[in-house]
């Protein structure tokens, strides 16, 4: 069951400040959070809504940057049917794959970072969903060539540029939006859809542009508002869901 959100107007507080000021505040928040990441480049165990999640060095922490925790909190049995086959792309620690595996028949989690692949595998075992969750190494759809899914989850890099190390791959990359849009339909089942999480730290319009140009239907599925940041989960579906073959 899907719940599409209605369009929302800027809050009165936001309207009081010029766009340039809001952009500067947003940049300062982001730089402070990214500068502090070296402190967390260690083995830790986080609890995400009561679920233990191991985070190993160079793997994106779902609580420190909050996106993984927010996304995982939206994955439940009201959304994911018991017979669903799910793809979690850019899985990182595997937090969304673990939450999806509690509901779905099967989940494939993929990541380009070998450390993330190992970390997600640990979390599948830790949370006893290894019988329904498989982790693969590779870039975007490459590890699932020829496979289709009822639901595709993607928390993509939100900054453009060349990553300097494996950890930066979680939030910095080039050309991801175009490659994702090019291949999405070939990996969706009939009536399937993708959930895409984007942050105001990035440029949502730029990321959604290739999907719009290819005729996908885009709606707001969930939103979270924080100091200096808004997270939005978009539901992406083909213009003709019955036309996916």
Where are these regions (language model features)?
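A short alpha-helix capping/helix-coil boundary motif
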Residues: 21-22, 49, 54, 99-102, ...
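Conserved SAM/SAH cofactor-binding pocket of Class I
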Residues: 72-154, 160-161
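N-terminal auxiliary segments of SAM/dcSAM-dependent transferases
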Residues: 2-48
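Charged, low-complexity, helix/coiled-coil-prone segments
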Residues: 8-21, 57-67, 118-132, 149-158, ...
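Rossmann-like AdoMet/SAM-dependent catalytic core
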Residues: 243-245
């Amino acid at each position: 069951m899907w719940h599409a959100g209605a369009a929302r107007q800027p809050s009165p507080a936001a309207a009081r400040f010029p766009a340039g000021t809001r952009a500067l505040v947003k940049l300062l928040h982001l730089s402070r959070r990214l500068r502090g990441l070296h402190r967390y480049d260690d083995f830790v165990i986080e609890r995400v809504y009561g679920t233990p999640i191991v985070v190993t060095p160079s793997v994106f922490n779902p609580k420190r940057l909050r996106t993984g925790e927010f996304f995982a909190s939206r994955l439940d049995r009201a959304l994911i049917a018991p017979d669903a086959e799910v793809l979690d792309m850019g899985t990182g620690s595997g937090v969304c794959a673990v939450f999806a595996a509690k509901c779905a028949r099967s989940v494939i989690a993929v990541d380009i970072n070998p450390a993330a692949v190992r970390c997600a595998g640990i979390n599948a075992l830790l949370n006893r969903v290894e019988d329904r969750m498989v982790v693969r190494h590779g870039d975007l759809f490459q590890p699932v060539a020829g496979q289709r899914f009822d639901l595709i989850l993607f928390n993509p890099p939100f900054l453009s540029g060349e990553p300097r190390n494996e950890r930066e791959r979680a939030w910095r990359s080039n050309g991801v939006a175009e490659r994702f849009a090019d291949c999405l339909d070939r990996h969706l089942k009939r009536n399937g859809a993708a959930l895409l999480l984007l942050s105001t730290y990035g440029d949502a319009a730029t990321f959604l542009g290739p999907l719009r140009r290819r005729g996908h239907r885009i709606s707001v599925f969930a939103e979270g508002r924080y100091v200096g940041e808004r997270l939005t989960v978009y539901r992406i579906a083909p213009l003709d869901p019955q036309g996916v073959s």
